[in-house]
């Protein structure tokens, strides 16, 4: 069974479901540990995805600043 990479939104939804299960349902210790472990993995993946997105946004902003700087020097 091959798993496709989950989108950020899918990971967040699964993480929310895990938190709800841990908060609201009577789950065994073993299941709680499994859910906690899965939640930690999802949290790390979400954090990584956000950092990648932030890096891309910063790169795009730097390109925009660079393009405006080039326009100003050619306009003079």
From Swiss-Prot:
Single GO BP term: DNA catabolic process
GO terms of molecular function: exodeoxyribonuclease VII activity
Record keywords, A-Z: Cytoplasm, Exonuclease, Hydrolase, Nuclease
Pfam family, one: Exonuc_VII_S
Record-linked InterPro entries: Exonuc_VII_S, Exonuc_VII_ssu_sf
Cited SUPFAM superfamilies: XseB-like (SSF116842)
This enzyme's EC code(s): 3.1.11.6
One GO CC term, this protein: cytosol
Similarity comment: Belongs to the XseB family.
Protein name as catalogued: Exodeoxyribonuclease 7 small subunit
């Amino acid at each position: 069974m091959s798993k496709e990479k989950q989108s950020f939104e899918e990971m967040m939804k699964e993480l929310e479901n895990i938190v709800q299960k841990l908060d609201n349902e009577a789950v065994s210790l073993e299941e709680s540990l499994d859910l906690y472990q899965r939640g930690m993995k999802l949290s790390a993946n979400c954090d990584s995805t956000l950092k990648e997105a932030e890096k891309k946004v910063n790169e795009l902003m730097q390109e925009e600043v660079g393009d405006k700087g080039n326009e100003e020097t050619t306009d003079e």
